[in-house]
Amino acid sequence: MHRLLVTSVALGIATPASADDSAKLPGVWKMTSWTRHEIATGKDGKSFGEHPGGYLIYTKGGYFMWTGFKDQRPRPAAAEPTDTERAALFKTMYAYNGTYKVEGDKIVDSVDGAWNEGWVGTKFIIDKYEVSDKTLTMVSAPFKASMDGAEIAVTTTYERVE
């Protein structure tokens, strides 16, 4: 049985996606913000820092790739990280890829490969998205965070780079 997961994405989009938005979705998008909203406490935070890194790529053929990195990640002391350094680096990133479908206001990502093997074979659901000029904003439904188990929703925004 496949688990249904919700991808990291944005809160508070007032207007639903249109058919025009889905046509504008393919491209290369650079992450510009990541905001975490804890459902139980109402607390907002920037768990990836003020300037997160990463890219989201959607192709016209239905494929996607997503990477996200915390700002100010620890730099290993040598070219080959120690196991402790590897663990610290691993805790400050996400990455996954696969195929996607636009279903009305939602984007359904079917995961083929991921930094966390437990995500492979799952679907990430992006509840709402909006493409405005060169900006992509995405909204998630509440989901359990893999870093600490808290029930959260996440806001991500991107700038089109290609």
Predicted feature locations:
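Lipid interaction determinants
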Residues: 10, 16-162
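Bacterial N-terminal signal peptides that target proteins for export
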Residues: 1-6
